Amino acid sequence: MQLPSVFLDSLKGTKGFDQTTFEKLHVSGEQITSIRLNPSKSPIGNHQPCLPAGRLPIENKIPWTEQGYYLKERPSFTFDPLFHAGCYYVQEASSMFLEQALKQTVDLSKPLRVLDLCAAPGGKSTHIQSLISPGSLLVSNEVIKSRCNILKDNIIKWGCENVVVTNNDPKDFAKLENYFDVIVVDAPCSGSGLFRKEPDAIEHWSENNVALCSQRQQRILADVWPSLKEDGILVYSTCSYSKEEDEDIVKWMNEKFLAANCQLLISENWGITKTDNSFRFWPDKVKGEGFFITVFKKVHHEDDHKTRVTKRLNEISAPQTELVKPWLTNSGDKLFVHGFDGIYMINKDFQPDINLLYSNMRVAYFGVKLGELMKAKLVPAHSLAMSRLLADSVMKIELNREQAIRYLQKKDIDVEKSQPGWQLICFNNHPLGWVKVLQNRLNNYYPMELRILKDN
């Protein structure tokens, strides 16, 4: 791998940059694979986090995150049913430092409104969701519609019920003044931190592109800043090494918005480079890709402008509610409403927030879609199968690995005859989706758009 000389020259003098070891690492071809476990996905009836050790080549723990692990090699995640069950997320190790940024600056035990502004494909959103309290609401946003669909799929797979997925430009959030307690901006960037992982990105790097990215990052931050509360926290990160997208942005935020910098404590053993009030991850010093992260606190308060609620979600009827309740383990604090294409469930406390977002944003998904009512019966949605709130009494069919892969390919599966009706397909007690057992056959209801296309 040949790194452009103009790129290397641009990094000279940057704290932590060692050209010799940096170039050597990129030539070595070494690849790092890491995962983050889903602490809420555990065998049905057992609420202990599941580490699929024996199934994945776990090497050791990532030191700055509770649920992160390095793998000895990269397996075929496509053919691991536990991946499709949402038991873990394949995520770059350096970016998991977000956990330290949040834990050290925010009381995560309190109910919070959190915005993940540039959220697709969902790594940071699923991470945030695992860290915040059940009474907190996460708005997970992606401006590009196709990527927003991928984000929605990953949110559903994670089993979240306190997340709203939106498809908005950052400027749209200016309408929600002083609304969020925490905003995470993993900004679009020139991508130099991923050169080792994605060598083709080298061809697209240029000084001009760095300048364009810096301007776009400033626009994004200026657009979203009004929606942050006074004393709120904004976490800014990139996968770029260029100071124009990193330290220069910090200086710009300090000067333009009087944003204060938050201090974080890190271990010297982690190999992370501290630059003023920010942190750089150099791949020749840490076991991860290139990454930059900093944390701002809003100390200047803008005047409030009341955001109007013009739309409200309509609750389903009492008889319909009685048809839905048996599918759920606990529905006491839940509200059942008519959504885009069926019945959705939300936490009652979130109703004002979701009505506000529904009135002012392009909401793509919220809460948990339960399904559709047909002939006074619920046709369950895939998202209900993925939800942690599904009742233990729901009938289940346990599959072996070969059967599970066939199910995920949306092929016919041979299982022992079972009681007719909707049944939950499981692998190692982890739900994968639905089948409907009929008298002479079994219908596979795994979503067509999620099916495995490759042969094992």
Residue positions per predicted region:
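C-terminal catalytic and target-recognition region of SAM-dependent MTase-like enzymes
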Residues: 239-342, 350, 433
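Polybasic, low-complexity RNA-engagement segments
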Residues: 1-38, 299-456
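Helix-to-beta-strand junctions that scaffold the AdoMet/dcAdoMet cofactor pocket
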Residues: 133, 228-229
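Mobile active-site "lid"/loop adjacent to the S-adenosyl-L-methionine
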Residues: 146, 185-223, 239-247
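S-adenosyl-L-methionine
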Residues: 152-175
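Short Gly/Ser/Thr- and charged-rich N-terminal loops/segments
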Residues: 50-57
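Conserved class I S-adenosyl-L-methionine
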Residues: 111-118
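A short acidic, Gly/Pro-enriched loop at the edge of an enzyme's catalytic core
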Residues: 175-182
